[in-house]
């Protein structure tokens, strides 16, 4: 009996190992990302991943563009849903990055960040891809306020697209992760109800007191509050009951790695560890540009978490 158990365990381990390469970054792509290094370089990283992404029109997916959740031109969102009729499907909302001063849900001729929505829709979910107002014209806490307005739109209207407003996962990357974290951490943004079931924070910043002196992007968005606890989400994240996933790349700039570990350790110290996702070989941009390719390093855990 013992021998049979050992053989079965070995077979399971071998099967798990065999499936791992399909989930991870291919070696040729890994070499290109590594050559860019621990810097934030969207154009060079996009040149690696854009050829791997599908082009419009997207088969099997229904896309509704530029729905308004507020009066500003940047208060807009796209909804992706499976072409087949769905109801009460889980919802994945995505908030892009851009150093608080740039970025969009979608660029002309670019597959990003449609790729994240396609991964959601092709896995039976409804995707919501939002953009928001930018610094320096719009300072803290505008980003979190816009996230809150978009969440309210989802609560009001997502059923018409087949989504379940009770099963919303809110995902942010880089500056978008800061806005998502701020929305979750500061109750003033969700006094009528938080409107999400869980949150995913990919390469975000949570304790700005550790980032001194503040960088130009932080100064542009936070103004005189840059570098203070007042704009840091850490304390609020330690109090929230929202389940969290925290992700970061091996080749992320050091401050993002440090902040992910800081948040993870602080939550674990309270006995409520987040789902921590370490992305071997990935950089700040490759981690999100790889979504909807054969590399499921990030998309696999996120889609599982969001169901």
Language model feature labels by segment:
Residues 17-307:
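Alpha/beta-hydrolase superfamily serine-hydrolase fold, recognizing
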């Amino acid at each position: 009996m013992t021998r049979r158990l050992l053989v079965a365990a070995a077979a399971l381990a071998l099967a798990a190992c065999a499936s791992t390469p399909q989930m991870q970054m291919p070696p040729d792509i890994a070499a290109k990302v590594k050559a860019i290094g621990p810097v934030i370089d969207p154009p060079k990283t996009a040149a690696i991943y854009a050829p791997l992404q599908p082009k419009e029109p997207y088969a099997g997916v229904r896309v509704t563009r530029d729905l308004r959740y507020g009066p500003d031109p940047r208060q807009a969102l796209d909804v992706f849903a499976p072409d087949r009729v769905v109801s009460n499907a889980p919802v994945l909302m995505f908030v892009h990055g851009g150093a608080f001063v740039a970025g969009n849900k979608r660029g002309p001729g670019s597959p990003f960040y449609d790729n994240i929505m396609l991964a959601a829709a092709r896995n039976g979910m409804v995707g919501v891809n939002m953009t928001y107002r930018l610094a320096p014209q719009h300072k803290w806490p505008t980003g979190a306020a816009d996230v809150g307005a978009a969440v309210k739109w989802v609560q009001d209207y997502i059923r018409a697209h087949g989504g379940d407003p009770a099963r919303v996962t809110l995902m942010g990357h880089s500056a978008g992760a800061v806005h998502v974290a701020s929305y979750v951490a500061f109750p003033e943004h969700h006094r009528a109800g938080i409107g999400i079931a869980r949150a995913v924070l990919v390469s975000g910043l949570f304790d700005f007191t550790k980032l001194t002196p503040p960088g130009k992007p932080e100064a542009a968005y936070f103004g005189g509050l840059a570098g203070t606890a007042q704009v840091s989400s850490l304390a609020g994240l330690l109090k929230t009951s929202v389940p969290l996933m925290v992700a970061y790349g091996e080749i992320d700039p050091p401050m993002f790695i440090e902040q992910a570990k800081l948040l993870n350790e602080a939550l674990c110290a309270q006995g409520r560890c987040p789902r921590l996702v370490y992305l071997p070989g990935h950089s700040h941009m490759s981690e999100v540009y790889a979504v909807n390719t054969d590399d499921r390093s990030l998309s696999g855990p996120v889609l599982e978490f969001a169901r």
